[in-house]
Amino acid sequence: MLPLLLCIVPYCWSSRLDPRASSFDYNGEKVRGVNLGGWLVLEPWITPSIFDAAGAEAVDEWSLTKILGKEEAEARLSAHWKSFVSAGDFQRMADAGLNHVRIPIGYWALGPLEGDPYVDGQLEYLDKAVEWAGAAGLKVLIDLHGAPGSQNGFDNSGRRGAIQWQQGDTVEQTLDAFDLLAERYLGSDTVAAIEAINEPNIPGGVDQGKLQEYYGSVYGIVNKYNAGTSVVYGDGFLPVESWNGFKTEGSKVVMDTHHYHMFDNGLIAMDIDSHIDAVCQFAHQHLEASDKPVIVGEWTGAVTDCAKYLNGKGNGARYDGSYAADKAIGDCSSLATGFVSKLSDEERSDMRRFIEAQLDAFELKSGWVFWTWKTEGAPGWDMSDLLEAGVFPTSPDDREFPKQC
């Protein structure tokens, strides 16, 4: 069991509340949001400097904190949490016409388990984020991004490698963490939704039946603390419409699907016209076929996997043939680091066109949450950079390439 946490910042929300209507209508309004990736859950490709400073064996937050030790890890991560995001970022999001921010958090923020090398302290900053978002008029979707044992084997779960979630007590431990998260935050009108777990990997071995049981338990926890909060379920890398008929009652369940074009050998080889056709087809075939609201909770402007460490620290890229034994499609030298200002005019125009197509496609259903707000330099992935460069529309309705879907 995880220890009970009390409020430690200037405000505190009641854990027992009268039911309220959702503070956002996911059936009627369009979600227009961005993720705060790489902040409270680290990813090597978003902040490579943190991982490079710890040596070659630091490939995820687990190994990073294990190598550094508790004291040094607390010092370095606290400095990162304090400096990476500020209140001004949330105002910039609002000024760009966004209405949501999705904030990943790991189970260890609620209290690391015995034997974990992780450090906690993230909740102080999540509290600040909710406050800043509310002041800017944004809604928050809190996302449980990492579960004990790893639900997908990706470094963004905290620990890459084997999928061990659903083994031993890991599901019960996850529910303990989720309960504490819900108790702490679901009293805030700013927190419109909470996500049960990020990217549970059914093709990779997560049992769908047990996942559905977990989703049911999460639904009960949310009802316990605030029946008006929407519950977000990841599609588990299955077609989102395959979840039709599951938890369709009422209007509080929202499905989350993630759509990327660089982790598939067929998609990554496409030209820009084919990328746009594919994203429009995805929306018509899958999003519009769902019986529940669906947000595309992760997507981006990049069409290659060239960003440094995107496939994991120490791994290469499909695009230039350095990942596994894939055939090279192109050159990653201008796409691995840096910002979109160094791209050619044609590359920036194609990226804007692709972004606009995705905005159109995803708003055929319930909307979108871009991945991610900020990086140390990953062209196409950094919304703050894309906005500044005019590659992402400065208002979500602005179009240089209208009606692509």
From Swiss-Prot:
Main location: secreted
Reaction it catalyzes: Successive hydrolysis of beta-D-glucose units from the non-reducing ends of (1->3)-beta-D-glucans, releasing alpha-glucose
Subcellular localization, as worded in the UniProt entry: Secreted
Superkingdom of the organism of origin: Eukaryota
Listed GO MF terms: glucan exo-1,3-beta-glucosidase activity; metal ion binding
Induction or repression: The combination of poor nutrition conditions and attachment of mycelia to a hydrophobic solid surface appears to be a major inducing factor.
Quaternary assembly: Monomer.
Protein's recorded name: Glucan 1,3-beta-glucosidase A
Organism: Aspergillus oryzae (strain ATCC 42149 / RIB 40)
Gene: exgA
